[in-house]
Amino acid sequence: MSQLKDQSAAASSRRTFIKQAAAVTAVTGTGSIIKTPVYGQNQAPSTGRVIGANARINVGFVGVGNQGFNTHVRQIKNNDAKHNVQATAACDVFSEYRDRAQEFMGVKSGNVYNDHRKLLERKDIDAVVIATVDHWHAPVAIESMEAGKHVLIEKPMTRYLSEGFDVYDTCKRTKRVMQIGAVFCLEEKWHKAAQLVRDDMIGKLVLGQSSYCRNSPKGEWNYTINPKLTDASVAWKRWLGSTGTRPFNADHFFRWRKYNHYCCGILGDLLAHKIHPLMIASGNPEFPNRVACLGTKEITTDRDVPDNTQVLANFPSGYTLMVVGSTVNQQGLPEMLRGHHGTLYFGGDKVDLKPETPFGDEIDPESFSGLKPSGADFVAEHADWFDVIRNGGETKGNIDLSMRAQVVISLAEMSERMSLTLLFDEKSRKITTGTGQEVQPLNYPA
């Protein structure tokens, strides 16, 4: 009986300690979620206008198609007074998109371009939103930061891994503020989970799981083709960029997410929205050390990329991430973060903590609700970026998180396409098989 009392007292003491630790964290702040070292910090930064806490931020937009216009141009313009910003200039290779952006922004024709380099020459532009086709993310981001501009880059950060590290190194060297356009990074529930993990509320992490599943009977990304797109209305060769030479193709222009030349499909478009948050929730995002991915396309065959995919990523701490994506079945996995002592369940603006049965005497079940922002809050995504530009700190989708997530995405694509499980060394940045054979990352044609 005495031994049972001692165990009960120990469990009660541990429960009290955990709650006290959580309270201290809540009062003092969580600090950076990144604990691992970063590279490229010792080089001189680029110059740019110093933006004070009350200064207006002038924003340029590169890529103003559907995502660029509706998510970024429209939202930033509609909230310009609230955020003290001005939608200043826009760039796109398609004249129809340029004209639409110009009219909505209310700017003169001299403020819209078909070459982003002209926009970057302007000294009055402080920040650039990049919502181009994926293979243009890296060159525009790098040139923007070299020109002293802060950047918001739509997910995925880059098309391929090597250029991802080019963006990463440039951001570290120039000290520009970067935000990834994976909007669910802004959801407070993931940051609450990170706090609970750091406070040892669920023990050592075991597995984080999520999914992004749709069912598109006509085929995902088969967007309407605008008949106004012609050889004369689009800078086709410029749009192709480093992907190689091929004849004008409207299907490729509007439905580019289906093709490996330009995109990795579900991985970059949908699962990026789940990989970033699950890495935040871990409390200390790491580079993966092993990634495996499967994929099939037995239902929608009009594409290169899979319509059904599953990703597993291991991390040095022992944490495993599992994400599933589909465009042919909408039933997803429950979102949860499993620890040795307890599990976190996610839903809407809520996180539920439930102890594992063997640890029920040590951990109380708890529910945390009303965690805002919640959902796809693009206004919050922009506000976070602008706030860090003015006041310093880290965005919720910062460069450290984004680079780690990009490694997962890029290795998952390689794994699926090569039918390999791949290992990653964060210090050397080398990719190998389980037998030690080095594997070169996918890249553009020579």
Give the role of each language-model region.
Residues 4, 11, 19-32, 44-45, ...:
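C-terminal helical cap and adjacent loop that interface with cofactors, partners, or active-site loops
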Residues 98, 134-136, 152, 165, ...:
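Tryptophan-centric aromatic hotspots in well-structured domains and transmembrane helices
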Residues 2-150, 162-177:
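N-terminal glycine-/serine-/threonine-rich beta1-alpha1-beta2 phosphate-ribose binding loop
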Residues 94, 211-217, 243, 295-298, ...:
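Glycine-rich beta-alpha junction loops
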Residues 155:
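Short basic (Lys/Arg) and small-residue
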Residues 45, 150, 158-233, 238:
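A contiguous active-site-proximal alpha/beta segment in oxidoreductase catalytic domains
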Residues 226-245, 352-362:
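Mobile, glycine-enriched helix-loop/loop "lid" segments at the mouths of ligand-binding/catalytic clefts
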Residues 230, 237-319:
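Rossmann-like dinucleotide-binding domain that binds NAD(P)(H)
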